[in-house]
Amino acid sequence: MFPDNVKFISTPRFIEGGAGADCFGNFNLALHVGDESNAVSANREFLEKHYKLPSSPKWINQTHSSVCVRVDSKFSSASADASYSRTSGVVCGVLTADCMPVFICDKRGTVVGIAHAGWRGLVGGVIESLIEEIDVEGNELLVHLGPVSYTHLTLPTICRV
């Protein structure tokens, strides 16, 4: 379904070879949740090797917003909830638990993007922001909705006219 040069990965909380405390899962990739930073670093290294990534993922500081940033090989950090790249070999990454990752690429595999889609981001338009930034005709886009932990998902009642 996706171009051969595009790879989307969703990781489990637990994996053989992972490091970290059980309360975070042994394959925690998040530095901001209180897990040991050396365990997270080891898991990030394992992620690159195990999944044969072409480069280290470009992580964003997720803020439950609709902000989308473009990343390339020189990208270091930004506060956003979506990122995209047109640079071959660049890996865009988001962290999710009770939010859903939304993967987007064009049919030719020349642009890839990912959104951290929680209810605040969805209401705020994070997916729309990503699609607008990617700037590809809708009939040329491919979308994959990643897994979400529905047992921890909180959805408030929202009415919008």
Please annotate each region the language model reported.
Residues M1-L155, R160:
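Active-site microenvironment for binding and transforming phosphate-containing groups
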